[in-house]
Amino acid sequence: MLNAETYVTSTEGTGGRIRVHNRDFEVEEIPLTEPSGSGPNTWIWIEKEGRTTLDVLLDIARELHLDRRRMGFAGMKDKRAVTRQWICVSNTAPSEVKAIEERIRNVKFLRVTANEKKLRMGQLLGNRFRILIRDTEIDEPLETAKATLQELEDKGVPNYYGWQRFGSPRANTHLVGRALVHGDVKGAVDSYIGNPLEGESEIVSEARRAYDRGDLEEAYELMPSSMRYERMMLRPMLRDLRRGEFSDESYVRAIHALPKPLKRMFVHAYQSYLFNRAVSERAALGINTHIPGDIVIDNDQHIIHDADPDELEELILNFEAHPTAPLYGSKVPLASGRPGEIERRILEDEGVSLEDFNSIKVPKLGSHGMRRAIRFRIWDVDAHESQEGLTVEFSIPRGCYATSVLREIMKKDVV
């Protein structure tokens, strides 16, 4: 995981491989509520394979001839997986939605019903995972996995952001965000459209090289349909170029051409990159203990004030409170003591200040920041073996990453 160095469990790693096939990695959303069956909005319980949530939403919006902003979902789900989740289409009849199912690639509509309310981001309890680990590398992988899961139940799981947060497989959205926070909008656009990486197809690499040469027309012509977001960014740049009006504002327009969830993700990815480093260094001091200077939150995300160290220690051991690290932003409080030293050193190493997160040249992409727990709780764990390999099952809260659990089991970086 990007910028993650620390393990919190004492077991050896099972090794192995995940996601050999999409069906090796299953995710099912744990909803906060079920739709009522009546109302102006249509909720769809979808199963998708090998596709991002955002791509599916865009396809459904296109087939229904709707603005993407009419679509709602509770959380992004993995691309390289089989996932099930609710999505919502506002002010649309279920019959209209059912009519387009066959036109949405690699997606099944398992249930289509109505509801009074729309579905908003974050409106889920968590996610349930069933993951097959193939080709394990030790003699007793099942016993090791069970021991690791038990330790994680006792201590908590490091709350690292997974590779998906950074735009896997390119995993460079944090670099786009870093450029934005540093005030370099051109550098942000260049990082996203250009900069071919090893492992990309030749046509994709050639399109990126054309962009890096400054040949925007050729880059656009070369780009396959899979580069839909790069093409979105290039359109306003090409329009300005053809009119002889190309300027620094053209790069701002390129960012604004993207769907809102994606363009917001850039700064969030950079915050996540820094957060992972803070978690890694803080977890090395003990993930389930209070260190003087910690900012501690309860399960409702409220900072706990005026509690003595012994009380905080007991709350943390009982999973009623959690040490935190910063998602850096213009208004986030920083810890004191040893945790605070870690947090301030990270800013110094990056050459940024908290205020830089609110001084971004692209409007509405700044962030005030927040404190986030350095660990999360895992529940309903299970593990078993078959001829295919080792299967682990567990549930985790919304916004947390299964790869953090797998990393502890396998003792290797996982994507």
From Swiss-Prot:
Identify the keywords attached in UniProt to this record, alphabetized. Isomerase, tRNA processing
Domain of life, per UniProt, equals Archaea
Annotated ranges, domain TRUD: 156-376
tRNA processing found in the keyword field: yes
Q: Name one Pfam family in it.
A: TruD
The UniProt entry, under InterPro entries, shows:
PsdUridine_synth_cat_dom_sf, PsdUridine_synth_TruD, PsdUridine_synth_TruD_CS, PsdUridine_synth_TruD_insert, TruD_catalytic
The name on file for this protein is Probable tRNA pseudouridine synthase D
